[in-house]
Swiss-Prot record:
This is Pyridoxal 5'-phosphate synthase subunit PdxT. Pathway: Cofactor biosynthesis; pyridoxal 5'-phosphate biosynthesis. The keyword Hydrolase applies. In the presence of PdxS, forms a dodecamer of heterodimers. Only shows activity in the heterodimer. One of its GO terms (cellular component) is cytosol. InterPro entries: Class_I_gatase-like (IPR029062), PdxT/SNO (IPR002161), PdxT/SNO_CS (IPR021196). L-glutamine binds at G47, E48, S49, R105, I134, R135. The gene is pdxT. It comes from Listeria monocytogenes serotype 4b (strain F2365). PANTHER family: PYRIDOXAL 5'-PHOSPHATE SYNTHASE SUBUNIT SNO, PYRIDOXAL 5'-PHOSPHATE SYNTHASE SUBUNIT SNO1-RELATED.
Length: 188
């Protein structure tokens, strides 16, 4: 059975754990670099990316997560996870640099501009995925190595590159497990 960690420093950790378990994998909370040992994949949940980065640096998680990815292990970042995984963050904040694109934080606006949207995802077919966007980022300037999986208003809101999957929205806040299934079946 696949073992998936969830970075447990902020965000919808329990919701990701429930989604992982409902998709048939084992879920574990990751708070220290040693917690990455033996995992097949890792989820970076939403939250506030600047705060998450500061906590990750304080607990010396940045380099171990980069090493985890360089071993070919899969990482799925949602919302702030997308921001942290991007090669660059608009404004120059440090990132993990694991997907070749630039993240625009709060790209759709602040909390009051949060919204839901139907996404047509070719890999899923019908019905459309009902995505929840909360202070959502998006990606710009992807390299040719990045596959765009979904857009809203011509803005990239889901993408993958090699073993890295990112969404600007929160699939863990829905009852639709297709993104986690995709991660487990195609990436891990």
């Amino acid at each position: 059975m696949k073992k998936i960690g969830v970075l447990a420093i902020q965000g919808a950790v329990d919701e990701h754990i429930q989604m992982i378990e409902s998709a048939g994998a084992l879920a574990f909370k990751v708070k220290h670099s040693s917690d990455l040992d033996g995992l097949d994949g890792l989820v970076l949940p939403g939250g506030e990316s600047t705060t998450m980065r500061k906590i990750m640096k304080r607990y010396d998680l940045m380099e171990p997560i980069r090493a985890f990815a360089s071993e070919g292990k899969a990482i799925f970042g949602t919302c702030a996870g997308l921001v942290l995984l991007s090669k660059e963050i608009e404004g120059g904040e440090e990132s993990l640099g694991l997907i070749e694109a630039t993240a625009i934080r709060n790209g759709f606006g602040r909390q009051k501009e949060s919204f839901e949207a139907e996404l047509n995802v070719e890999a899923f077919g019908e019905p459309a995925f009902e995505a929840i966007f909360i202070r959502a980022p998006y990606l710009i300037e992807p390299s040719n190595e990045v596959a765009v999986l979904a857009t809203v208003e011509n803005r990239i809101v889901a993408a993958k590159q090699a073993n890295i999957l990112v969404t600007a929205f929160h699939p863990e806040l829905t009852n639709d497990n297709r993104w986690m299934n995709y991660f487990l079946e195609k990436m891990v």
